[in-house]
């Protein structure tokens, strides 16, 4: 059976892992790194993913996409504020969805995330020596139904069979508790690049049971970065009367500098942010520079409200689990943003415990996802592990007066299924529209609409007579399926989903084909680059041989030099057929030259030996020795 992998598709960085000998192991990428930046850049027909994309971001800000996870499965009206601070163009798409415009083309967030997944899987396949198709992908525990579906679709667009979508804190708990014995109540505090989750689990005898989960999908390390960006921009504006945030290139440099400063302040009390030539004076065209010193105290002042926001989900998770802080045995920190000293301090204040830092906050989620993949595939080394998760938000339907009728409360164990009977409000009503909602507010307008389901073909009956059976079914991925039928007549009617933020089946199929075509184009482009590089490397070797074998026959040297010169011109021309011809000519010239050079050296060696022998003969002196007495 081919290996399955676990993937942490993160806001800022992503990680892939698999089971090796009963233990989860991170798979390094093609660059040799254990984490891959969740960054995708578009340059003409070429797509760059990971560190190579991040490195060129400042020069290509409009087409370098990052933090796309913040937009996946979201409605435009939910992300306007976040969209406005990006150096690239984020806009409203069909049905109120989100689209990212790059070089005149609109991309769905799922497409961009699929590029990251494709890179992770391609690199892992190369490392493992086998093609990977099966994966468990993690999502923040507080992701709603649309965001989970969109993440699953991203996997499908990348050509993956998504075995399961699991919550990030739950995955981290799997990694933490895999080899631990005894019973524990664990609080996982997961503050990543773009989202924040708190999950409380009970661990014991191979059972990982989630008691409660809470979170904030609009809070993460990028928000802390943004406070530094705004501070730097305001400081610069006061001095030069120019807002750097309006210049995409300058904004990209600010974002990168802010992230570096935040990381440095985790280990230092202050840091210097230096950005020479950040922009030009619009009147004099002289270069302007930015240099500021940021202290840890100032950073905590800038982010004070964000730090306060991490408290409420912890308190809510404890309340929902009906536990107090003293009932928690261990506090596990997950996500790179938990390295911020103020965050650690707040966690300790709330829980009264020193956080357990035994797991790598960047890798724990992917490692746990790999464990889940192993469980699904029946890895004998794992034994009997049972994972019991919950749905993070209440699911319900809209009823008369714009109220919400809850169907499945938050923190219900999944999979879960619930059926309720509804009826009509008017006589002879031919159909009903069922609005499916997710959230905790009592009024429908204040919650997220997951979709509108129309049940049509109800026979004419007085109001209140029809019995409309609505069933909510949440699968193990936390994804909701809704069915409805009219019981009185015994007839069933079809349901169609309208106005959802996720892609329909035809969109996914189209994007899968596009991704496959892009992958083929990328392969051909990579082959062209490799051929060009191989020819150039051979040219350098040829010049080296000419340097080392100066005593070789002149005609052989001339032929090799001419072939090397043609190779140089072919590389510059970028003409495939010319490159192939030049490669053959240079290989042939190299063989001929090496043969001629060896023959020449052997002849020289032979002549040298003969001369030496002659000398020995010439040096013989005839002499009569007088015998010793």
UniProtKB/Swiss-Prot annotation:
GO molecular-function terms, A-Z: ATP binding; ATP-dependent protein folding chaperone; unfolded protein binding
Organism: Deinococcus geothermalis (strain DSM 11300 / CIP 105573 / AG-3a)
Entry keyword set: ATP-binding, Chaperone, Nucleotide-binding, Phosphoprotein, Stress response
Annotated spans, Disordered: 514-533, 543-629
Annotated TM spans: none
Stated family: Belongs to the heat shock protein 70 family.
This protein's encoding gene: dnaK
UniProt-recorded name of the protein: Chaperone protein DnaK
Biased composition (Basic and acidic residues): 555-590, 615-629
Pfam families named among the record's database cross-references: HSP70 (PF00012)
Modified residues (Phosphothreonine): 195
């Amino acid at each position: 059976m081919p290996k399955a992998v676990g993937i942490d598709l993160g806001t800022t960085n992503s990680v892939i892992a698999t089971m090796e000998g009963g233990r989860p192991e991170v798979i390094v990428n093609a660059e040799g790194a254990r984490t891959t930046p969740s960054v995708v850049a578009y340059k003409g027909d070429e797509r760059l993913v990971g560190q190579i994309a991040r490195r060129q971001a400042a020069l290509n800000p409009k087409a370098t996409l990052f933090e796309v996870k913040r937009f996946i499965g979201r409605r435009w009206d939910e992300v306007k504020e976040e969209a406005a601070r990006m150096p690239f163009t984020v806009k409203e798409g069909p049905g109120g969805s989100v689209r990212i415009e790059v070089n005149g083309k609109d991309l769905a967030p799922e497409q961009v995330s699929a590029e990251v997944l494709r890179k992770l899987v391609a690199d892992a396949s190369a490392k493992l020596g086998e093609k990977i198709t099966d994966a468990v992908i993690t999502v923040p525990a507080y992701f709603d139904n649309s965001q989970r579906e969109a993440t699953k679709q991203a996997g499908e667009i990348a050509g993956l069979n998504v075995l399961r979508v699991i919550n990030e804190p739950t995955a981290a708990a799997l990694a933490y508790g895999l080899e631990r014995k005894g019973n524990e109540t664990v609080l996982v505090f997961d503050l990543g690049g773009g989202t924040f989750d708190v999950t409380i689990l009970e661990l014991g005898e191979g059972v990982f049971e989630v008691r409660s989960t809470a979170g904030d999908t609009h809070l993460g390390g990028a928000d802390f970065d943004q406070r530094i960006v705004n501070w730097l921009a305001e400081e610069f504006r006061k001095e030069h009367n120019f807002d750097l945030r309006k210049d995409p290139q300058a904004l990209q440099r600010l974002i990168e500098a802010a992230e570096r400063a935040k990381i440095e302040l985790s280990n230092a009390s202050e840091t210097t942010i230096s950005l020479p030539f950040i922009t030009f004076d619009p009147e004099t065209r002289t270069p302007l520079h930015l240099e500021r010193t940021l202290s840890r105290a100032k950073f905590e002042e800038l982010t004070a409200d964000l730090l306060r926001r991490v408290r409420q989900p912890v308190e809510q998770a404890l309340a929902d689990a009906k536990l107090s802080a003293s009932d928690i045995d261990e506090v596990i920190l997950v996500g790179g943003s938990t390295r911020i000293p103020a965050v650690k301090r707040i966690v300790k204040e709330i829980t009264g415990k020193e956080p357990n830092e035994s797991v790598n906050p960047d890798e724990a989620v992917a490692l746990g996802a790999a464990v889940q993949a192993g469980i699904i595939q029946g890895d004998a080394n794992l034994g009997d592990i049972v994972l019991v998760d919950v749905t993070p938000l209440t699911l319900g339907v809209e009823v008369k007066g714009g109220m919400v009728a809850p169907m499945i409360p938050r923190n219900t164990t999944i999979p879960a299924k619930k059926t309720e009977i509804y009826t009509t409000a008017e006589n002879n009503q031919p159909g009903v529209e069922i609005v499916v909602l997710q959230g905790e507010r009592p009024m429908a307008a204040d919650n997220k609409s997951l979709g509108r389901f129309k049940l049509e073909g109800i026979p004419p009956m007085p109001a209140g007579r029809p019995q409309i059976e609505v069933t909510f079914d949440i699968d193990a991925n936390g994804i909701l399926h809704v069915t409805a039928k009219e019981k009185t007549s015994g007839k069933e009617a079809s349901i169609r989903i309208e106005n959802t933020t996720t892609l329909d089946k035809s969109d996914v199929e189209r994007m899968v084909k596009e991704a496959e075509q892009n992958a083929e184009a990328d392969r051909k482009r990579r082959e062209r680059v490799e051929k060009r590089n191989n020819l150039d490397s051979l040219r350098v070797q040829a010049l080296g041989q000419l340097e080392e074998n100066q005593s070789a026959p002149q005609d052989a040297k001339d032929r090799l030099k001419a072939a090397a010169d043609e190779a140089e011109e072919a590389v510059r021309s970028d003409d495939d057929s010319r490159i192939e011809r030049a490669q053959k000519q240079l290989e042939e010239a190299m063989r001929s030259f090496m043969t001629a050079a060896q023959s020449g050296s052997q002849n020289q060696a032979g002549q040298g030996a003969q001369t030496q022998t002659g000398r020995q003969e010439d040096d013989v002196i005839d002499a009569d020795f007088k015998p010793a007495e």
